[in-house]
Amino acid sequence: MYSVSPTQTELFHLRLLLLTVKGATSFNDLRTVNGEVYQSFSAACLALGLIENDDEWRRAMNEAAEWMMPRQLRRLFVRILLHCQPLHPEELWENFKVAMSEDYSRHFGILQGQQKAYAQIGTMLIAEGKSFTDFPQMEQLIGNYEEENYITLEDAMEIGTKQYKQLNNKQKVIVDLILNRLDNINHNSNCFYIDGPGGSGTAATLLPAGKTVHKTFGLPVSLFADSSSSIKIQSKEAQYLRETDIFIWDEAPMAPRYALEIIGRTLRDIMNNNLPFGGKIIILGGDFRQLLPIKLHGTRSEIVNLSIKFSYVWKYFTSFSLSKNMRVLPEENEFAKFLLNMGDGVLNDSNDNVHLPDNCIASINANIAEDIYDELIRNKEFNKMAKCAILSARNKDVDEINIQVVELLDTLEERIYTSIDSTENCSDNDEINEVILPEYLNSLSPSSLPPYKLRLKPNCIVMLIRNLSINEGLCNGTRLIIIELADHLLKCKILTGDKVGDIVFLNRITLYCENVYPFTFKRRQFPIKLAFAMTINKSQGQTFDKIGIDLRKDVFNHGQLYVGFSR
């Protein structure tokens, strides 16, 4: 098919329709969407969601107004502000302010109800690190934000006391020491590392009100030795860090040492002293048997050197080790010992291979997708299915297995969602936009983005690939099961974290991929991937009732086999 420049508006959109619409026999057919004939090819493309404008968000809010309670609708509006860059957010508020404020309006009247709903939207933005000042088109509020329902001190004390009673003796020794240090600050040694082999602690995804390290300390996405925090000394973020007594960082061994060093410098600057980490109590948790930091095309020695153990601040840490596996039954102790030996390298032969027990190995003709999921799907045991996973070392193998599992589900309610793909930062060579065809962009599938075509069915297991709202439990790596499919929204149930069981609604957002192509690649799509199967790296920190591990191709990183077997 001939290429057409985007400057030839109608011809460009005609070409886009010819690539998308199946079975059309006339121009009228191409301009018909859901029974309505549009006046132009560009209008038909808009109706099909093939090109960008704010109508996507208006339609999503329209669908949401039928499904959601007002508070959920406000959360969706905040998510659109944060992740979708609407051109006219003030119009979106005006169009849906009645629906977003119904709960308040019943008690306070329409005008005051809308004011309170708007104030709570401001509070939600602040909780995500933004405010109305980041959206100058919106009416600005000075103070008077609606308070969120935070946990009380009494409730926190009750929860803490209950959890303390559940600790084993080794855990109590560590907790008592740290609590004592909190009451009697010793400026020389306030840093602790707790080594926890798989199953010896609590999964970090189960801990409430957590935040990512990058967001808490203002770390850049790409970390280097000379990177610095974005937090300003006089900012509210700095004041939050100043008032925090203890920082607990789980899965710390996965982070590059630069992250730990930046945090140390940032806390010293904020506390205005030269003490390690500004004198704060720092608790790192993790397991060096698991995955180490990722360095693209890095050698073995470069990856090891990137570990926090090789940082100049590691000397300030006192190490403890937990050994009792809290997840296994007494009859599984032998397997727990096998796991520990695998992680410690005891099982490796002279070629660094591990010989697995025969009872762990499937027959050569086995189909891993059917073995794990087929019976559960046929019996409609979707809750059990949600507690299973297939793990593989490579994204390509994961994608193939996910396609196989989706085939096992009922096809009657299947929907295919296509993305809108474009480029940015092409100003150095304006002609690039003339050369790049839409179908070329559609063919790109970087691992950091969802696919161009998302083929979904009810009861599909999916995983978020972006942090949408930590307060809602919508973090990168959160698994969900799809309940219902609409044109612009997905109704899902959360399967992991402290928000397990919550019903949430996902909309398309704008995602970016940088430093992979000669341009910034932009894709508007639901921020999810199928997750019947996932990479071993993505599974770290999660727990399943049943797993299958695809080892048709060898693992290639330190800790991958150990992580896979300890899920």
What residue ranges belong to the model's regions?
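Long, low-complexity, charged/polar intrinsically disordered accessory regions
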Residues: 1-137
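RecA-like helicase/translocase P-loop NTPase motor core
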Residues: 1-2, 7-10, 24-52, 130-567
